[in-house]
């Protein structure tokens, strides 16, 4: 009887070790529902997040957090004004001393 219990426990552990997590939601969900083409003043930015495409969202998302009120705006990565903003921010970071 003891050997049977050990064998059953081993089979259960081997079976459970092969189970992998499956996401509950299979829908595509992006953080940004709507995007803005309006230019943003770099001085009014608190934080700028760039979220690359993933399995959950096929688009590049750029989220700007503003200094006043902590408002978050989704920016259009294809907009010329936003491309200029990204360039200005990256140049500012590269000039910053380590």
Curated annotation (Swiss-Prot):
Gene3D superfamilies: 2.40.50.40. It holds the Pfam family IL8. Disulfide bonds join 30-57, 32-74. InterPro entries: Chemokine_b/g/d, Chemokine_CXC, Chemokine_CXC_CS, Chemokine_IL8-like_dom, CXC_Chemokine_domain, Interleukin_8-like_sf. The keyword GTP-binding does not apply. One of its GO terms (cellular component) is extracellular space. It comes from the Eukaryota. Keywords: Chemotaxis, Citrullination, Cytokine, Disulfide bond, Inflammatory response, Secreted, Signal. GO terms for molecular function: chemokine activity; CXCR3 chemokine receptor binding. The keyword Disulfide bond applies. The modification Citrulline is found at residue 26. Residues 1-21 form the signal peptide. It is found in: Secreted. GO terms for biological process: adenylate cyclase-activating G protein-coupled receptor signaling pathway; chemotaxis; G protein-coupled receptor signaling pathway; immune response; inflammatory response; positive regulation of release of sequestered calcium ion into cytosol; regulation of cell population proliferation. Chemotactic for monocytes and T-lymphocytes. Binds to CXCR3. Belongs to the intercrine alpha (chemokine CxC) family. This is C-X-C motif chemokine 10. It comes from Macaca nemestrina (Pig-tailed macaque). The lineage of its organism: Eukaryota, Metazoa, Chordata, Craniata, Vertebrata.
């Amino acid at each position: 009887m003891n050997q049977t219990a050990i064998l059953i426990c081993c089979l259960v552990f081997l079976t459970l070790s092969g189970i992998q997590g499956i996401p509950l939601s299979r829908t595509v969900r992006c953080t940004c529902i709507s995007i803005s083409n309006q230019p943003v003043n770099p001085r009014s930015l608190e934080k700028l997040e760039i979220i690359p495409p993933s399995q959950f969202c096929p688009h590049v998302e750029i989220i700007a957090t503003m200094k006043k009120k902590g408002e978050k705006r989704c920016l259009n990565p294809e907009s010329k004004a936003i491309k200029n903003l990204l360039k200005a921010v990256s140049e500012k970071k590269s000039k910053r001393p380590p």
